[in-house]
């Protein structure tokens, strides 16, 4: 067994620097002068096992082979590991004799990942040659947010510059860019039409208040009611007879007394409560006819 391991160890030594030749002349010269560490027990065992597994699975990656070899090494017992441990000790003793001044110096990492490179998307997910297009796309999309809702893009632009992720070129289409803009003209509510009709109806009722305030200034709440119902100036109502004015004034007092607590007026509230519900509907009819001027000719 030891003879087999010695042949496996001695034979691949000239092939150890083949991978470094492709790195360049300077790297190859440095690798030849560099003294390698002695192999441990796992490396002695995995050298032959790795070759077998690579022949059985030619498409398997080297990292996957290393994972499987590590799992298999843990499953071995101490008796099975003993010959490889002894061989590792022998190689270490030979290494110390050949290189007495050897000191382990780990290699420095040549490339240090920046924060921007660490959180950026990998280039394999994008189409080749799309990096040059992505910069223009990201700048164009950041400009879409500049005057949105009337606010300038001061702090948000800085954040976008720091977090400028590469995006797909299809995001530059005009349909998608229009989605980032708000159209304030389309935010008109349909409730405005109903509000205008409500205000127009209120103006017809408020047009009667000047005529009533000229007749009687002692009516309760007429001043406040006229101030609440102030709207657009409307055309003055036609002349109304004294009979219709008294009827409308009485109905108007009944409507006001409906919302007042009992005891505030000298009138009989028990009689008013019975006539309130009956007088509300004729009030609108008489008010509408008085304002629109559709009274019979006999009353004029």
From Swiss-Prot:
Compartment(s) of residence: Nucleus
Ranges of compositional bias, category Polar residues: 13-30
Residues recorded as bearing Phosphoserine in the entry: 235
Annotated DNA-binding residue span(s): 35-103
Ranges for region Disordered: 1-35
Segments carrying motif 9aaTAD: 251-262
InterPro entries: HMG_box_dom, HMG_box_dom_sf, SOX_fam, SRY-related_HMG-box_TF-like
Keyword Nucleus: yes
GO biological process: brain development; central nervous system development; negative regulation of transcription by RNA polymerase II; neuron differentiation; otic placode development; otic placode formation; ovarian follicle development; peripheral nervous system development
Chief location category: nucleus
Domain notes: The 9aaTAD motif is a transactivation domain present in a large number of yeast and animal transcription factors.
Annotated PANTHER family: SOX TRANSCRIPTION FACTOR, TRANSCRIPTION FACTOR SOX-3
Summary of the function given for this chain in its UniProt record: Transcriptional activator.
Protein name per UniProt: Transcription factor Sox-3
Naturally occurring in which organism (per UniProt): Danio rerio
